[in-house]
Curated annotation (Swiss-Prot):
It comes from the Bacteria. Belongs to the DXR family. NADPH binds at T10, G11, S12, I13, K37, N38, N121, E123, G203. It comes from Fusobacterium nucleatum subsp. nucleatum (strain ATCC 25586 / DSM 15643 / BCRC 10681 / CIP 101130 / JCM 8532 / KCTC 2640 / LMG 13131 / VPI 4355). HAMAP family: DXP_reductoisom. This is 1-deoxy-D-xylulose 5-phosphate reductoisomerase. The keyword Transmembrane does not apply. The lineage of its organism: Bacteria, Fusobacteriati, Fusobacteriota, Fusobacteriia, Fusobacteriales. It is an enzyme of class 1 (oxidoreductase). Pathway: Isoprenoid biosynthesis; isopentenyl diphosphate biosynthesis via DXP pathway; isopentenyl diphosphate from 1-deoxy-D-xylulose 5-phosphate: step 1/6.
Amino acid sequence: MKKILILGSTGSIGTNALELIRNNREQYQVVGISGNKNIDLLKKQIEEFKPISIYVGSEQDAIYLKKEYSFIKEVYFGENGLAELSKNSDYDIILTAVSGAIGIDATVEAIKRGKRIALANKETMVSAGVYINKLLKEYPKAEIVPVDSEHSALFQSLQGFKKENLKKLIITASGGTFRGKDLAYLENVTVEQALKHPNWSMGKKITIDSSTLVNKGLEVIEAHELFNVDYDDIEVVIHPQSVIHSMVEYVDGSIIAQMGVANMKTPILYAFTYPEKEYNSSINFLDLIKNNNLTFEEADRKVLKGIDLAYRAGRTGDTMPTVFNASNEIAVELFMKKQIKFLDIYRIIEEAMNSHQVLTLNTDNALNVIKEVDREIRKKVREQWEK
């Protein structure tokens, strides 16, 4: 039986993971979960799966839950709580499904313990990829299996081939909510419009990121760090049907693609079972006859600038990807609060990147540098844009 620790159990990926486990309880045991503010759902999960360790955002909620459930041995909260949960819990696999830079420390602790990380937190590799890769070399028993559908597709399509056989990675994108729209249209789009993704059911933040194509930009940086592939050999292609989740082109002209329904359960399950594949009754199967029209097109990077900003951040390297990520996180938060317009998201990211003096990350102090830059950028954006 595999012991699973789920960070972000109340979010979209976390709830999908728990549904997979619910349908295969003889194979998996949930030893720990974490939620932030959705206490009602967290309580239901605690009652059903009976984890012995949990994390919650506030001290008040932590005290309440510890009193409420006698079987819980440890309750963590606060800024360092997720890392402590990762450091102290007894698990085989940790699913990092929290959004934001808070997931980095928890991943670091899991690597130091030689665990498998089912990675669904983009920021870990975007902001701290250089440091994480260095750490993985120091702790070779640890492994990262990506959960993001595109990176899972690339990971699967790369199995069994040498890196010198590779020509390029092709990351597919649905195009998001505003595919085909012009700048005049985007100037006044609402939060409600941006949250209507055509294919995927996801959390609010990642849905907004998909509408700006910043999400795809983050995926480009993450792919560079995960697979050690140059940015010139990573391509983004719009694929509106979201059936092909990504592809790998090889030097002999062949392209290997991973296909499936637009659902996060398959990549989550693969991260749990790798290198094997396992049936689960909650998985839906792709009907090729019904999905017989697969199309591809170029992304309109002049209108939806998230991809180009990411390539710029990634090629600059060092602390610039952290700036890209942190400024976007605050910009999306302000947009969802209706304090800025949709196109202001790009303006905020560009301003933050243009004004940043890049710091190198080739020292043992890299993680502290990343955290400090992350804090500074968030503070600066809030001061300039928050109403």
